[in-house]
């Protein structure tokens, strides 16, 4: 129920930012994916519907080329499948992903403000510094490794948090948005808080 509410607000944020438009070309594709995943995870139908809807919207906005859409659609299908596989296998892993994502964002913000220094990609993320990013990466790496994960996997997961954040920051800059919404006062919207886990879950 909580996850469904979170995803509902994400959809609302995308609608408010005018991300949602002209998706009628994807009704058939949406239906096929919906049926496929329903067979695999019949008890997660509402959450899956929300996720697919969100990412079909993103595909429509950012990938006007037909073949790119198909390639990206496959990657999104993998993402959704992995996400709900995690939920069904072990909810503790799901909660761990949320915790690591929150920890990484918080550390990057705090140390970026304290130490400051040069920015990484000012044109995309004007507040993200090298100091905050490196410290959050190192601490996240050790936390992930502490829970019996191989060191290489821990590194990949820690790096993925950064790229998820940058990816959604790029989307916002392309659409002249500071945040997806102001639902969380001073912290943007729900989607702004969950962006870093996008590639984390896929890995």
Task: Indicate residue ranges for each PLM-predicted region.
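Cytosolic, membrane-interface loops and tails of multi-pass inner-membrane proteins
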Residues: 106-128, 167-189
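Final/C-terminal transmembrane alpha-helix of multipass membrane proteins
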Residues: 193-203
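Residue-level preference for nonpolar/small residues embedded in alpha-helices
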Residues: 103, 163-164
